[in-house]
Regions:
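A charged N-terminal "starter" segment
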Residues: 1-144, 188-192, 219-222, 226-229
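Short glycine/threonine-rich loop-to-helix capping motif typified by GTGT followed
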Residues: 206-212, 243-255, 281-291
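Charged (often Lys/Glu-rich) extended helix/loop segments that serve as interaction or gating elements
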Residues: 258, 267-323
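Conserved anion-binding
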Residues: 116-117, 126-192
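Glycine-rich beta-strand-to-loop/alpha-helix junction loops that act as flexible
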Residues: 200-201, 234-243, 274-276
């Protein structure tokens, strides 16, 4: 945890004692370090500075409007998965020009909202969704910029609850289906094909899956180009993990190096969707002990926060340190 330290037996964030915050605003409360957020954005940007790229922070990782506002000030774009997240981004940034919209269940109303807000592009996850986008764009008299989320069927070697890039998952379409969909949409007047997208999951701590997926996507890009479909953006999603309990994920520079090597000759802008790697260790849940109790040989410490405030441990047994 950067900028969270003990001094005089008290936990501080950026030299501010958390006891003071608890006394002034109460608990439970989320406390974030702006210095940590700024540092992580800077490190990520510097890692990719040698190639054309756009960093689109994954809003799902933390949708606090004040955090989104800071990211906008620092020049990042945003990856969203709902109309509600788009609403938050517009409140924070005032523009959707650097917004990309993911998710297999976009509604007609959300697609309309996205097109009216002039987002950068929509990531299409099925042929049926493509038809809904065409219909919505036609009604609005506009053109939809789209990328197709392509499933490379690579095992990301992460927890099955947060794996998204294999055949058994609901996200995206397979390589061959993606090719057919690009060819079908090529001459649709309401559609502008601008990119190809791949996202394999979250909390990935090995480079192998990323490299394997890039090889598959690179072959598809070459195939499409030979069929008269040049693309501007390669959206490689997010998923880079962080350390919770001894994991050793690749550093941003190592991650960037593999992506740069695989994409530098494609002539495309690489879009990145970092989420937890930016915000994961930039904040804490500040809580207060309410009561202690024992039942048999079990001892409980009851606090004023619940699983709704920090759901990962009860949902799938993830580890979080207690400070």
């Amino acid at each position: 945890m950067h900028h969270f330290d003990y001094s005089g037996g008290r936990l501080h964030c950026e030299e501010v004692p958390l006891q003071r915050i608890a006394d002034e605003v109460g608990t439970p409360a989320y406390i974030y370090s702006e210095r940590t957020l700024r540092r992580h954005v800077r490190v990520f940007e510097e890692a990719f500075q040698s190639i054309p790229h756009l960093t689109c922070y994954a809003v799902k990782a933390n949708s606090n409007v004040n955090i989104l506002r800071r990211f906008s000030e620092w020049g990042t774009g945003f990856e969203i998965v709902s109309g509600g997240e788009l609403f938050r981004v517009l409140k924070a940034a005032g523009s959707a020009s650097k917004v990309i919209f993911d998710g297999p269940g976009k509604t007609a109303a959300e697609i309309r909202f996205a097109l009216e807000s002039d987002i950068l592009f929509l990531n299409v996850e099925s042929g049926a969704e493509a038809d809904l986008i065409i219909e919505t764009a036609r009604r609005l008299g506009t053109k939809a910029r789209i990328s197709i989320r392509t499933n490379p069927n690579v095992d990301p070697k992460t927890h099955p609850y947060i794996s998204t890039g294999m055949k058994k998952h609901k996200f995206g379409v397979g390589i061959s289906e993606a090719r057919e969909l690009y060819l079908r949409l090529k001459n649709i007047p309401e559609i502008e094909l601008v990119g190809v997208t791949c996202h394999m999951g979250s909390q990935i701590t090995q480079m192998g899956p990323f490299v394997e997926a890039l090889a598959s996507i690179g072959a598809l890009i070459g195939d499409l180009k030979s069929n008269g479909i040049p693309l501007q953006y390669l959206d490689f999603g997010g998923g880079l993990g962080i350390t919770y309990n001894g994991e050793e994920p690749p550093s941003p520079s190592c991650y960037a190096g593999a992506i740069i090597d695989a994409t530098k000759n494609l002539g495309m802008t690489v879009v990145l969707e970092p989420g937890r790697v930016i915000v994961g260790n930039a904040g804490i849940l500040l809580s207060r002990v309410v009561v202690r109790k024992s039942q048999g040989d079990k001892h409980f410490v009851i606090i004023d926060a619940g699983m709704n405030d920090l759901i990962r441990p009860p949902l799938y047994g993830s580890h979080h340190n207690i400070w």
